[in-house]
Amino acid sequence: GCEKTIHELRSAYKDGKAIVSLDATNAYNTLSREAIFKVADRFPIMKPLITLMYANPSHLLHKDGVIMSEVGTRQGGNSSSTIFCVAAAPAIKSTSQISPNVDVHAIMDDISLTGDAQELSVAVPVMITELAKVGLRINLKKSVVLNCPELAARLGIPAVDGAKILGAWIGDDGKCEEFLDKQLNKCKPFFALTAKLAPEIALPVLSRCGVPRSNYLLRTHLPDHTKKFAINFDDMTLTALAAILRVPLEQIRREEVIRCIHLPLAMGGLGITAAAFIAPFAYDASVNADVEGAETQKSLTSQLNKTIIGSLPEELVAHLKLGENAGWIYSMQPNPHYGQGILLQVTGHSDVVCICSCGHRSTQRELALHALGCTKVHGPNVSSRHAAVKSTIINFCKRNGIAISDEPVVYHDGISTKRCDIRLVLPTEDVYVDVTIANAACKTHAGKPLSTIERNKTRE
């Protein structure tokens, strides 16, 4: 689709062919209803739907009343894109018949023509005329011509040395980096706002909506051109991740940590893909956009993940393999509902189904809670589950450079004497931690809202 068209246009540009990119003004809202009903005549199966949606004028609500719309496709309609493409297809077909040596690249309302300048001087006016027959008007001032100033002058269209077509840069390589920098800047507000969300929401949003923002650009631009972009994009991602996990950015930026973060969830990572790691694979797979290309990317990605695992310390690899009960702790903040106890929560992707060794099926976050109370994982006694949580806290503190003492300690809070499990030795004062295994860790409570779990814990 879009990616293939971009590669074809860039290849034509490199070969010195002239390129004309046409801009259709407000295309979806100007397509004639007559053209839409011709679609119904050509494809009878679509007639009931088109009759239902377009037989009568559409009501457009406005602050001053209702506007009756009698042109264009319905905004947001599931069939609107299909109807638009089928209605505009005759214009493209007519142009191709008159100028068979001209290549027409059309994705929705984004239409580009490539070929010999002389033939384009004939084909472009034909295309403009044919599109006008279905209600589409071409704005010559916003259209562009690449590789041929003479053709641009003849058509009355601006000549440029590069342009954004289908969301990618086509033209002078020297300006590609500038284009990618602009795309990077557009992502900054998203990452900044994502970091302010609640952590259990922020991490899935970051991995599913933030990280993929680089995919299209990586797949449609040469790795040499995206190298700087990928590095800066990864740094932006890591900055947001550090804010979400509430850890110093310097710790997140360590190469060892970046590799762990990059690994997929199934391998114990966070699934926060590093753009710099996958850029070459992504571009090659896009250029070879077929089954073979997809398999190649899958194979190379698998090989990369194995290489990353092989480069990590054995202790860390062993920890990553604890898929049943390992979770990434994002905070260790006192919770007033727990009598100022530390509330541990784990990040999770709610639709990722995991299976415990006891056979319990659950989502990742709930499984982490279930595993703490699962006798199959930790044994029948409470002490082994207690040890698992205690060990997690100790490892978390050690990784963050906090001095600890895991010898049983006695703490007096001014009211009573308490026996605690861990003492955190901080510059200002010591912090005492006591680990309690409660029903909140059991699978029967794992799916309940946090407020319910807090209420049950407080009562206990």
Predicted regions and their residues:
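Inter-domain linker/hinge segments that demarcate the starts of reverse transcriptase
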Residues: 6-14, 18, 120-136, 183-192, ...
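Active-site metal-binding core of divalent-cation-utilizing nuclease and nuclease-like domains
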Residues: 338-366, 392-447
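Short, conserved micro-motifs composed of acidic
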Residues: 118-125, 129, 137-162
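E2/UBC-UEV (E2-variant) core
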Residues: 444-460
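Short Cys/His-based metal-binding microdomains
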Residues: 274-277, 356-389
